[in-house]
Amino acid sequence: MKFTRTLVLASTFLLATVATSQAQEVKRDTKKRGEVVLKPITIISHGKDNIEATGGTVLTYKDIEKLQPANVSELFSRQSSIAVSGGGGPSKRIHILGMEQSNLAVSVDGVPQTATSWHHTGSNVIDPAFLKRVEVEAGAAAADSGFGAAAGAIRYETVNALDLLEPGKTFGARIIGSYGTNGRGFSGSTAAYGLKDGFDWLLMLHGTSGHNYKNGDGTEILGTEPAARNILGKAGYEFDGNRIDIGYERSRDKADRLIKMNMGLPGDTEYPLEVARDSVNIKYTRTDATDMWDPEVQFYYNRNDYWRNDYQNRTNGNMILKEDLYGGKLQNTFTIDYGKITAGIDFGKHDYNTDNYGHNDRRYRKFNTQQVGAFTQGRFEFDNGFSLSTGARYDYSRFADWNDEVFSDSGASVNGTLSYKFNEHIEVFAGASRTWLGYVLGDYGYVHARNNAFYTDPTFSPGRARNYKAGVNFGGADWSAGITLFDTRIAGLPNYDSQKLGNDPEEYRSRGFTLNARYIWNYTTIGATFTKAKVTAGDDPVLPNSGSFMPIGDMATLFIDQEIPDYNMKVGATLAWAGRISDEAATAANFYDQPAYTVVNAYAEWNPPAVKNMTLRVGVENLFNENYYERTSFAPSQKRGGIDPVWAPGRTFTFQTAFKF
C-alpha cells in the first residue's frame, strides 16, 4: 500500500511537470502575478513583521481560494506546525507546535477572542468561508499582538466588499454551492457587496447540512454532522480622510453531539448541543495618514454561549457556559527614517457565567477578569543589513472569583528579534520574549462539576512565558527555504483540582525545529514543511489526552499546485504525514502507541470559457481512505473500559459550483 501511494504521488508530480512543459508555449512574467512572486527574505518589510521569515505561517486569500476549506482541518492541511483534531465543528482543537491556540493571542479582524472554555470542546474558530488571511506568529509575539500572547499570536482577517468587488464595479454577488459524500452533505454560501459614495458594504451567509461521517474503516463517528449557520456583515464609510468600519459576525452550531466531543467512550450516546458566538466591532482609521499621525481606534463586544441542557442527572452532565468579552484599543503608528513605531493602550473585561442546573450544591457561578495595558513596538530596517523588531508592554490584571475574592497584579513583557542579511539570498535571525500573562483561567468549565466549597487558593498568581527562536532563511527569485529552532516555556497556568483553583506546578515546554521550502516554476508551485517538536510537562512528555499541550512528534506536508491556462484549469494535491509516537510515560498511563499515518488530498478546478464567471471544482480528501486520527486527538487508551479517538473522515468527495457576478 505504501508503494502504491508513493507511486500515485510521484505520478501526480510527473503529470504536473509534463502539463507545465506542454501548456507553456508562451512564457509569462511572474512579476505581474502577485500570487506567485516570492517575497524577499527579511523579518521586516516596509515596517511590518514578515511572519513566515521567523517560522510562522501566513495564508493569503489566494492560498485559501486554492484550498476551499470546508473546516479548519482543511484550512491548515498544508502546515506541519499546526495540528487540528477531528470530529464535528465544535470539537476541533487547534494546536500550534503542540500548544492549543488558547495559549496564543487569538484575534479576528483585530478583536481578541475567548479561550477554550472546556477541555472536552474544541477551540473557538472562525468560519473559513469568511476568511481572506490568516497569520500564525508562533513563539515571540510582538507587543501590539495583544494581551496574553504566551506562545505567539493568531490573526484571522475576514473579507470585505473592497476585497471582492471587480475593478470598476460598484456592486457584486457571489454564490457557492457544494455537495459532499461521506456525510458532508450540502453547503451553501451567498454574498452580496457594494460601493457607493464612499460607503461600502457586505453581507455573507454560510450554512451546512449533512450527516455523521464514517472513518476509513467504514465506522460511523457519532456527533460529527455538519450544522453551521453563520452570518458575516460589514460596512465601511470614508469621508474627509477618515474611515469607519463596522463588523458583525454570528455563528451557530446546533446538532446532536457526544458529551465529550474529543473522545469516544463505550456506550456513547448523542445529546442536543448548541454552541453560539456573536461578535460586534467598530474601528476608526485614517486614509490620509501622515508619518506622525496614523491612528487606529477599535471597540468590540464578543459573546460565547455553550448549551448542554438535556443530559442525564449528574454533575458531569447539564451545564450552560456564557462568556462576555468587551474592550478596546487605541494606538498610533509613527514612521521614522528606518522604520515604524506603534504605541498605544488596550483594555478588556471578561465575564464568565456557569449554570449547572442544580445537579450539585452550587448551581450558579459568576466571575470575571479585567486587563489594562500599554504597549510599544518598533520595526526597523537598517542600511547595514540588520533588521530589528522589538517592543514592550505593561499590563494590569484583576480576577474576581465566584466567592467575591479579588486578586490583582501587574507585570511587564518584552520581546526582540534581530536579523542580519548577508546578501539577497541568506538571512539569519534570533529572537526572544518574556511575557507576563495575568490571571489565566484556562478551561474554566471544570467548575461545573465542583461543589459549593470550591474556592480559589489565596496564593493563586499570574502566569508567565518565555520564548526563544533562531534560524536562517535562504531564497531567490523563484525559491525559498528556511529552518527555525524554537523553545517555548509556559508556567503559572491554572489547576482545577477537586477542592480549589490554584496554579499548576509544572512548566510546560515545546521545543524543536521547523523546515520549509517552496519553489515556483512557471505555472507550477511546489512546497514542503517539516516540524519536529518535543512537548513536556516538567521533565515528562505530555500525555495524548487532548489537553492544552499535546505530543505531536514528527509531522510533514508536501503540496503542489499547477495551473493549465490553455484549458482554464487548476489542479493540486497535498500530502500530510505524521510519524509514530511511542513513549514510556504514555504507556504507563494506559495509552496505546500512536501509529504513523499518511493522508493525501487533491483537487481540480475548471472555468468554462463560455461562462467566465462560473467555476467548477471537485476535491477529494483522504484519497486512499486511510483510517487514522489527527495527532492532537485523544489517543486510544485502556482507561474507562476503553477510550477510542475521534477518528478522522474516510475518503470524501466534494463537488462545488461557484458563480460571481
Curated annotation (Swiss-Prot):
As for family, the record states: Belongs to the TonB-dependent receptor family.
GO CC terms on record?
A: cell outer membrane
A Pfam family per the record: TonB_dep_Rec_b-barrel
Which PROSITE patterns is this protein grouped with?
TONB_DEPENDENT_REC_3
Q: Which gene does this sequence derive from?
A: bhuA
> Can you say what this protein is called?
Heme transporter BhuA
Q: Which domain of life is it from?
A: Bacteria
Q: Where would I find the TBDR plug domain in this sequence?
A: 48-159
Q: Where in the cell is it found?
A: Cell outer membrane
- Where is the organism placed in the taxonomic lineage, from the top? Bacteria, Pseudomonadati, Pseudomonadota, Alphaproteobacteria, Hyphomicrobiales
What is the role of this chain? Answer: Heme transporter.
